[in-house]
Amino acid sequence: MTLKDNPPPFLHFRRFEALMQVPLLAILTAFIVAGILPNALGQLGNAELSIAVVPKGTDRERWNAIHQGALRASEELEREGVSIKILWKGDTATSRDKQIQVVDTFTGQRLSGILVASFDEDKFAGRIRIDRGSDLPMVYIDSGLDADRPISYVATDNFEGGAVAADRVGQLIEGVGNVILLRHQQGDSNAEAREAGFIERIKSSYPSIRMLSIDQYSGDSFSNANRVSEYLLNRYGRLVNAIFASSLQGTDGMLGALRDFDLAGQVFLVGHDASDTSLEAVRNGEIQGLLVTNPYKMGYLAVTTLVDHIQGGNMPTIVDTGITLVTMANIESDEVKEALGASSESL
């Protein structure tokens, strides 16, 4: 008996393997031609995306608007075939440490991406660098970070917003007079940018405007803002022609103080961010300018930007959501209604 008549077992296996390769290749080719295999492989890329959204807080309408914008984006993406889940987590207390704990919890999970509105730029960015080896993409909403990983910053140009406020003040007092800047609080990078933009524009464009005070802070409560505002009016009430309050709390607190001093409508007030109180004051002429952003649009664009990046698109460094100056003349316009979230369908 020869080797040809009775081959060893391993030769039988090799012949069987060679025979099997032909039909398998034919099957795969048929699947590709029929479009079955690409569709099957595509399903692997259609797993549900999990995107965490971490706001500065959960007890203010601004953050709820960001949440609603994010949900709107997820609903539209679902209709386009992108399965997506929004995980919303914040704290009612305005605590930097608690926010970092929330982000730490999320970064330890299997997420597709994360959206963050940070409290403290320096402190938060330092914490993020510890985890910079992670490939978790992040988009920063409302405030930016000097972080190392690829990110996008979806927010308003706050420096430009401060310049817009300065121009409104300059227009109101015709380029001549005394003004007060009521700051928000130290560590708030958004407010600090607005304040810097205001000061720079006054100095560069309005040489006949004198800044009486630029070192007082309203803080994060109406009561403190009102107290500081009364101090400023006690000291400068007979001299001041116009005031810029760089925060929601400062605007409402200063408005209350102007009313108490019978100066509302006589001393011009330009504020930032909208409340029912401040909007009514615009209508009745007690506030002559109100800078408003569009948090709904921020949430919407943050999600769509992040998903585009996850799907292979280029993530822009900055997505500017714009700022609107609200006055008595335009408060009922569609532009203002959209910025205030009253006409979100126009997105």
How would you describe each model-predicted region?
Residues 1-49, 130-134, 343-344:
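Short, low-complexity disordered leader/linker segments with a strong preference
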Residues 4, 17-24, 34-35, 189-190, ...:
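Hinge/cleft segment of the Venus flytrap/periplasmic-binding protein
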Residues 68-86, 203-208:
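Signal peptide-proximal N-terminal region
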Residues 122-160, 178, 275-283, 287-288:
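Flexible loop/hinge segments that line or gate small-molecule binding clefts
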Residues 55-67, 86-98, 120, 154-164, ...:
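Hinge/beta->alpha junction and helix N-cap segments in small-molecule ligand-binding domains
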Residues 51, 70, 164-206, 212-216, ...:
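An alpha-beta-alpha
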Residues 114-132, 198, 218-280:
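Hydrophobic alpha-helical
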Residues 241-248, 255-322, 326-335:
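Exported/periplasmic ABC-transporter solute-binding proteins
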